[in-house]
Amino acid sequence: MEQVSAAKLAVLEDILESAIQEERKLVVIARFLPEIRAICRLSEKKGLRYSIITGAVKNRDEQVAQFQNDRDVPVFVGQIATAGLGITLTAASTMVFYSMDYSMSNYEQTKARIHRVGQRMPCTYIHLVAKGTVDVKVLRALRNKADLAKTLVDDYRSGLNPFAS
């Protein structure tokens, strides 16, 4: 039996219902395959068709095209390590991070899937983070990495070389 947070699924269900009522498409990103399977089951339970990209999916271009072009496919489910590069998901302007990994590169690249040329709506990012879980640590680590990167760039732009010995 795979363990997946029932609380997160309940929140995601509310987000899905809201998006569908407003006729908006939604991208849901997760790290682990059991979570992805649970998200797919939730979509099926709601009668929603979805596109999916994980490491095992071979027809990625078809999955993306289906999500981008088919009004009857309102949900895209992606694994953060494999759905974060080289695809355009501008049919949606909302992305839900069901779970994340510690890679700042994966995080930024994944966010950029909906925030690219062709996007006509403001982008919204929702992070499902439960107090007292590893999710808090991952989000904190990503924020610290972003702060460090900003500091290094700001120092470099102001004439300080953070890499000089």
Regions found by a protein language model. Name each.
Residues 76, 95-96, 114:
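Short, well-ordered beta-strand core segments
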Residues 102-165:
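A conserved SF2-helicase RecA2
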Residues 39-41, 87-91, 108-109, 139-140:
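Short amphipathic alpha-helical segments
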Residues 87-100, 123-127:
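A short beta-strand element within the Helicase C-terminal
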